[in-house]
Swiss-Prot record:
This is L-threonine 3-dehydrogenase. Its cofactor is Zn(2+). Catalyzes the NAD(+)-dependent oxidation of L-threonine to 2-amino-3-ketobutyrate. It comes from Vibrio vulnificus (strain CMCP6). Pathway: Amino-acid degradation; L-threonine degradation via oxydo-reductase pathway; glycine from L-threonine: step 1/2. It is found in: Cytoplasm. The keyword Zinc applies. Zn(2+) 1 binds at C40, H65, E66.
């Protein structure tokens, strides 16, 4: 049986609608009928066919890794799922036999394979993944929100790396993940949550999500904002979401002594760092990749159920046949999360 899918068919800019074989269910797998998918920044990199994509992505391949769907097939070894369960899923497929996997630190697996990056993705009518990777969505969480659990998980993993209660938090980079991290920080009790960017559309979106201040660093100095807020000692926690060297270095300058930084944004490999700031301030820097399995997922569901409102971050919906419009708006930078409807 042939099904509809969005694939990287050629080693050049673009993503194409195509037909592929329906995936085959393995003994330990679930077959998921896709309801909605969201376009990730990673998918935009793959669309643009940048240096990272050229080194990483096999062609041809179905892409995508942010989704919600319904279980329609269950492998014979699988327990704990039923036909009709609504699920999203962890996009990092881990080996199960390295030291970190066996020690319960699966997010640190050294043999991680990415759905829609190293193997067939979710931008199709059906997806097969290991049942271990599926996460049941509580009934009171919408399909829209469930479809963005993967990037929301990046935000939650980054934000909850350190205690935020009563702390002043600086977030550099107001992409969807940065904005969601800001909303999480505010929800769990941070005092001042300041987010920086140069994209006014995204900063406005951050304001709608309740940040203390959204700062356009092309027009305003961070030092002035700190003074206006009555901050005398610098930020306690930094969440770096941009991969931008000047953003990271301004974060280092404005951190308090003993401050803690979580890095999710991917900087150029030759980024210069003022290490004196790190050493003499006694800063702690932690790299973040993916989500903790599955602690982050439980936290995500609980945060939404306890009143965290992420709905403003979802700005556009398109039918899957209009996927090109979705990619165009994502590439313009004038969007939050963009959802493609497969039903």
């Amino acid at each position: 049986m042939k099904i509809k899918a969005l694939s990287k068919l050629k080693p050049e800019e673009g993503i194409w609608m195509t037909e592929v074989d329906k995936p085959v269910l393995g003994h330990n797998d679930l077959l998921i009928k896709i309801k909605k998918t969201a376009i990730c920044g990673t998918d935009v990199h793959i669309y643009n066919w940048d240096e990272w994509s050229q080194k990483t992505i096999p062609v041809p391949m179905v892409v995508g890794h942010e989704y919600v769907g319904e279980v329609v097939g269950i492998g014979q070894e699988v327990r704990g799922f039923e036909i009709g369960d609504r699920v999203s899923g962890e996009g990092h497929i881990t080996c199960g036999h390295c030291r970190n996997c066996r020690g319960g630190r699966t997010h640190l697996c050294r043999n991680t394979i990415g759905v829609g990056v190293n193997r067939t993705g979710c931008f199709s009518e059906y997806l097969v993944i290991p049942a271990f990777n599926a996460f049941k969505i509580p009934a009171n969480i919408s399909d829209d929100l469930a479809s963005i659990f993967d990037p929301f998980g990046n935000a939650v993993h980054t934000a909850l790396s350190f205690d935020l209660v009563g702390e002043d938090v600086l977030i550099t980079g107001a992409g969807p993940i940065g904005i969601m991290a800001a909303a999480v920080a505010k929800h769990v009790g941070a005092r001042h949550v300041v987010i920086t960017d140069v994209n006014e559309y995204r900063l406005d979106l951050a304001r709608k999500m309740g940040v203390t201040r959204a700062v356009n660093v092309a027009e305003q100095k961070l030092d002035d904002v700190m003074a206006e807020l009555g901050m005398t000692e610098g930020f306690d926690v930094g969440l770096e979401m941009s991969g931008n060297p000047s953003a990271f270095n301004s974060m280092l300058k404005t951190m308090n002594h003993g401050g803690r930084i979580a890095l999710l944004g991917i900087p150029p490999s030759d980024m210069g760092i003022d290490w004196n700031q790190v050493i003499f301030k006694g800063l702690v820097i932690k790299g973040i990749y993916g989500r903790e399995m599955f602690e982050t997922w439980y936290k995500m569901a609980s945060l939404i159920q306890s009143g965290l409102d992420l709905t403003p971050i979802i700005t556009h919906h398109f039918k899957v046949d209009d996927f090109q419009q979705g990619f165009d708006i994502m590439r313009s930078g004038m969007s939050g999360k963009v959802i493609l409807d497969w039903e």
